[in-house]
A protein has these predicted regions:
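Claisen-condensing/thiolase-fold acyl-transfer catalytic domains that form or cleave C-C bonds
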Residues: 1, 107-191
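Short beta-strand segments
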Residues: 6-12, 34-35, 106, 176-179
Length: 191
C-alpha cells in the first residue's frame, strides 16, 4: 500500500569481553524511523551501490554472548567496502564529492568514520574538505556519547547531524554509508 507508513527499528547490543580490544567500543541502543511515500524531513534520492562478501572479520559464535573480532582486519574491510561502494556510486551518478553537503557513516567507533571521510576527501579542495569535516564532527557527537549501536549507528549519526548542525538547508544532498561486518556495504543519498 503506497500510502501506508512503515516504522523501521534498528536495535542491537554490542557486548565484548572484559579487557578485550573491543570493550571500549561497546554500546547498546535503538533507532526508530517513520518512512512514508511523502516524507516531511528527508527523502531517498534513489539508487544505491552495494557490495556483499563472506568475510570472517567479526562474528558471534553460536552459544556465545560476546562477539569475536579481528579489529585491524575488520577496519581494513570497512574501508575497502567504503571505497568500493562510494567509487561505484560516483561512477553510477556522475557525482563528485562536491555534490554532497555531508557524508555520514556507520560508526562502530567514531574514528572509523573519520578514516573513511579522509579517503573520500582525497579528491576534495580545502573548502569542501573543511565543510565535510565540520559536519562529520556534528554527526558523531551522539555516537561518542552512546557507543556502538551496530545497526542503528548510521541513523544515530544522521540524527546527530540534523540536531547539531545549523547550516544545512532543505534539499542538501547527504551521502550515507551503511555497513555490517561479515560483510555488506551500501552507499546512498538523501535529500
Amino acid at each position: 500500500n503506497p500510502d501506508s507508513k512503515a516504522l523501521i527499528i534498528g536495535a542491537d547490543i554490542a557486548k565484548y569481553g572484559l579487557n578485550t580490544p573491543g570493550e571500549v567500543t561497546q554500546g547498546g541502543g535503538a533507532v526508530a524511523m517513520l518512512v512514508s511515500a511523502n516524507p516531511k524531513l528527508l527523502s531517498f534520492e534513489g539508487g544505491s551501490t552495494y557490495l556483499s562478501r563472506n568475510i570472517m572479520d567479526f562474528w558471534r559464535p553460536l552459544g556465545h554472548s560476546e562477539a569475536l573480532v579481528d579489529g585491524k582486519y575488520s577496519s581494513n574491510v570497512y574501508l575497502d567496502f567504503f571505497n568500493n561502494v562510494y567509487s561505484n556510486y560516483k561512477d553510477k551518478t556522475g557525482f563528485t564529492i562536491d555534490n554532497f553537503e555531508a557524508l555520514l557513516f556507520h560508526l562502530p567507533y567514531t574514528k572509523m568514520g573519520l578514516k573513511a571521510l579522509r579517503e573520500a576527501q582525497k579528491d576534495a579542495d580545502a573548502k569542501v574538505s573543511a565543510k565535510l569535516t565540520h559536519r562529520f564532527e556534528d554527526s558523531r557527537l551522539y555516537n561518542r556519547q552512546v557507543g556502538n549501536l551496530y545497526t542503528g549507528s548510521l541513523y544515530l549519526s544522521l540524527l546527530s547531524l540534523l540536531e547539531n548542525n545549523d547550516d544545512l538547508k532543505s534539499g542538501d544532498r547527504l551521502g550515507l554509508f551503511s555497513y555490517g561486518s561479515g560483510a555488506q556495504g551500501e552507499f546512498f543519498a538523501m535529500l
